[in-house]
């Protein structure tokens, strides 16, 4: 039991790393297809990932020590089907006239190991039927393939990292794990009466995807800035006469001003999140509206505080009266506070799906392009 606790703890430690790798593609997929991220779907998907990770750790770990690994030179296989039944009977020590000995059937190691293998795959079948909407035949095949993946991994010594298998390839494990997946498929059937169906979850996602959430804006902007950074690096030889920050500014302004004209209102970030820039009067904005929109956006949110800061510093340098230092510091603090309140107000308005100042002045807005399937 202690070994299982250690392995489970290792899965908990690895989970954040797996989540970090998986999250960005998952967010991109959901926003592109549904236009939103539903918390219940996130819970289901991430619990499925955590389950698979625990399953992997339980089957693969612990790895052999270096001393043990040095002795591994063969690939062991047990190919007799249902041998586990013979093992259970052999270790049961049942005396028909003594009912208490019947418990040895379920309390011996051979039985417990196979029960663990059975229940290990039960959630897999449940997830496949409920969330992924797989049929019985698909669940059977996928459960078999999952078990086969683990057995081959063990047989090959983590795909020949080790010179031999450190665990036994057992055909009974294939049988029991596959039965576990089928059992999970059967168990979740009655529960689907009370659980929201996958179609219902998708319907809610599509409905929410018609609105432009603050997080959706942030995700779109994140992808855009990532692409801009890549373009800046790749185009650096063509703009070597400019400072790297100036080159970044040129690429940024060109990206947000020209690309939407060519794509009828979409940047790469918009495409990923299934959004587009449209005119507040309907249709496509005038060509200069894209430039105005992002000139105002970057000018107010990024450059204005820098210029204000520089102006205050120049003013303080000109007026070197030490007795007024506290007053200058107070002015700086008040300006910073006002700017913070402005950002806070803007964030609240975006969260409430209100039009922002640069959208009103450029007569543009962000609109969802999600197609309900």
Regions found by a protein language model. Give the residues of each.
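Bulky hydrophobic segments
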Residues: 1-165, 182-273, 279-373
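Individual transmembrane alpha-helices with interfacial aromatic-anchor signatures
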Residues: 168-179, 330
């Amino acid at each position: 039991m202690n070994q299982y606790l250690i392995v489970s703890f290792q899965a908990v430690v690895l989970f954040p790393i797996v989540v970090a790798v998986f999250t960005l593609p998952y967010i991109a997929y959901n926003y592109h297809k549904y236009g939103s991220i539903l918390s219940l779907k996130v819970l289901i998907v991430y619990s499925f990932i955590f389950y698979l990770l625990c399953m992997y750790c339980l089957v693969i770990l612990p790895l052999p020590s270096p001393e043990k690994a040095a002795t591994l030179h063969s690939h062991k296989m047990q190919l007799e089907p249902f041998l586990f039944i013979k093992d259970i009977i052999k270790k049961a020590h049942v005396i028909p006239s003594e009912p208490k000995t019947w418990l040895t059937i379920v309390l011996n190691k051979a039985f417990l190991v196979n029960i663990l293998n059975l229940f290990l795959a039960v959630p897999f079948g449940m997830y496949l039927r409920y969330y992924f909407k797989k049929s019985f035949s698909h669940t059977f095949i996928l459960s078999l393939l999952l078990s086969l993946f683990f057995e081959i991994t063990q047989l090959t010594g983590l795909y020949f990292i080790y010179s031999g298998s450190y665990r036994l390839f057992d055909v009974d494990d294939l049988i029991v794990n596959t039965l576990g997946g089928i059992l999970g498929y059967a168990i979740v059937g009655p529960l689907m009466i009370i659980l929201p169906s996958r179609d219902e979850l998708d319907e809610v996602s599509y409905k929410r995807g018609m609105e432009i959430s603050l997080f959706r804006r942030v995700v779109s902007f994140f992808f855009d800035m990532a692409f801009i950074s890549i373009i800046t690096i790749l185009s650096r030889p063509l703009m070597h006469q400019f400072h790297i920050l100036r080159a970044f500014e040129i690429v940024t302004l060109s990206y947000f001003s020209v690309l939407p004209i060519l794509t009828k209102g979409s940047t790469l970030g918009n495409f990923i999140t299934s959004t587009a820039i449209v005119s507040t009067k309907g249709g496509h904005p005038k060509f200069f509206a894209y430039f105005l929109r992002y000139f105002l956006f970057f000018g107010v949110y990024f450059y204005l505080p820098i210029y204000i800061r520089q102006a205050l510093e120049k003013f303080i340098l000109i007026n070197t009266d030490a007795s007024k230092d506290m007053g200058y510091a107070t002015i700086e603090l008040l300006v910073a506070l006002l700017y913070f309140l402005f950002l806070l107000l803007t964030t609240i308005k975006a969260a409430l799906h209100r039009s922002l100042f640069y959208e009103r002045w450029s007569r543009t807005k962000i609109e969802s392009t999600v197609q309900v399937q």
